[in-house]
Amino acid sequence: MLDAFSRVVVNSDSKAAYVSGSDLQALKTFINDGNKRLDAVNYIVSNSSCIVSDAISGMICENPGLITPGGNCYTNRRMAACLRDGEIILRYVSYALLAGDASVLEDRCLNGLKETYIALGVPTNSTVRAVSIMKAAAVCFISNTASQRKVEVIEGDCSALASEVASYCDRVVAAVS
């Protein structure tokens, strides 16, 4: 946020002028878009438990073998690890959305994730499915189309933010595939 403000100040200072006109309008647009971004992150964060548990439940419904003896979600400890991993992935997706940049997701979450899952015997196709379900839910919350829960939204189109969060989820899918 400071970068946008700093750019405007530096630009105005180089002209020996007050911040006004198009620079002021650019800041207003930035602030309005920033509020939408904060709201989008808040929608994900305030619904994260629901998003993750629904994704894991959906993954298990489609592959019931995961909760049978020998399955990767069999025993409470493994189920808890699966839910924890879903929470971590969604948390880093929300960080990327907040920053408007995928580097935090790439560096701190995805780097080495596939190799770790392979070493632990985690089926990547199940992870891909869970992330796909989380993606659909996050997009619904951001675009305010979630069927069971509507939220107060800032006026304006949030489709760009919905697309952005979808792209971060797609990065997760690509990283573990």
Swiss-Prot record:
Record-level GO cellular component terms: chloroplast thylakoid membrane; phycobilisome
Positions where N4-methylasparagine occurs in the chain: N72
Q: Which residues bind (2R,3E)-phycoerythrobilin 1?
A: N72, R77, R78, C82, R84, D85
Signal peptide positions (record): none
Can you tell me which residues bind phycourobilin?
A: C50, D54, C61, S147, Q148
Q: Which GO biological process annotations does it have? A: photosynthesis
One further remark on this entry is: The light-harvesting antenna system in red algae and cyanobacteria is formed of phycobilisomes. These are composed of the phycobiliproteins phycoerythrin (CPE), phycocyanin (CPC) and allophycocyanin (APC). Cyanobacteria also contain phycoerythrocyanin (PCC). The phycobiliproteins all share the same subunit composition and organization with variations in the covalently bound open-chain tetrapyrrole chromophores.
Q: What kind of modification does the protein receive after translation?
A: Contains two covalently linked phycoerythrobilin chromophores and one covalently linked phycourobilin chromophore. In the PDB entry, the bilins are named as phycocyanobilins although the modeled compounds correspond to phycoerythrobilins.
Which SUPFAM superfamilies does the entry mention? Globin-like
Keywords tagged on the record? Antenna complex, Bile pigment, Chloroplast, Chromophore, Electron transport, Membrane, Methylation, Photosynthesis, Phycobilisome, Plastid, Thylakoid, Transport
What role is this protein assigned?
A: Light-harvesting photosynthetic tetrapyrrole chromophore-protein from the phycobiliprotein complex.
* Gene that this sequence comes from: cpeB
**Coarse class of the protein's main subcellular location:** plastid
Where on this chain does (2R,3E)-phycoerythrobilin 2 bind? N35, D39, C158
Subunit details for this protein? Answer: Heterododecamer of 6 alpha and 6 beta chains. The basic functional unit of phycobiliproteins is a ring-shaped hexamer formed from two back-to-back trimers contacting via the alpha chain subunits. The trimers are composed of alpha/beta subunit heterodimers arranged around a three-fold axis of symmetry. The phycoerythrins also contain a gamma subunit which is located in the center of the hexamer.
State the taxonomy lineage.
Eukaryota, Rhodophyta, Florideophyceae, Rhodymeniophycidae, Ceramiales
Q: Which domain of life is it from?
A: Eukaryota
Q: Where in the cell is it found?
A: Plastid, Chloroplast thylakoid membrane
Describe its membrane topology. Answer: Peripheral membrane protein
What protein name is recorded for this chain? Answer: R-phycoerythrin beta chain
Q: Which family does it belong to?
A: Belongs to the phycobiliprotein family.
